[in-house]
Amino acid sequence: MGRVRTKTVKRAARQIVEKYYGKLGLDFQYNKKVAEEVALIPSKRMRNKVAGFITHLMRRIQKGPVRGISLKLQEEERERRMDYIPEKSELEVPVIQVDQDTADMLNFLKISLPNLKVMSFNAHEHREDTK
């Protein structure tokens, strides 16, 4: 069974990963040396725990975004995804078909849509494409 990591170890490892992401890798020994260089860790045992959690976080980061860690690379990727504009809008449809009740509601609310077409639908009629 695994051991529970303390809040101190997790917090220290997250801060080191955020600041020195470019220097770190998936190798525990290398991460241990980097942690020793960049942080004042009081004991050897604590340094090893921090380095172990850094290695664990680096593996998780490679799989995808990790909660609680803000990396410049991930921020840029998120910004790029949010700023994406599709070539063809899904909202631009040639004709919007509505029944008479819906058309009356839109008129009451003073909403005018350019491609609106009022259709008469039978309540008992079942459309083929709704299956």
Curated annotation (Swiss-Prot):
Entry coiled-coil feature ranges: none
Keyword vocabulary terms for this entry: Ribonucleoprotein, Ribosomal protein
Protein name per the record: Small ribosomal subunit protein eS17
Family: Belongs to the eukaryotic ribosomal protein eS17 family.
InterPro entries: Ribosomal_eS17, Ribosomal_eS17_CS, Ribosomal_eS17_sf
NCBIfam families documented for this protein: PRK01151.1
UniProt-listed GO biological process terms: translation
GO cellular component: cytosol; ribonucleoprotein complex; ribosome
GO terms for MF: structural constituent of ribosome
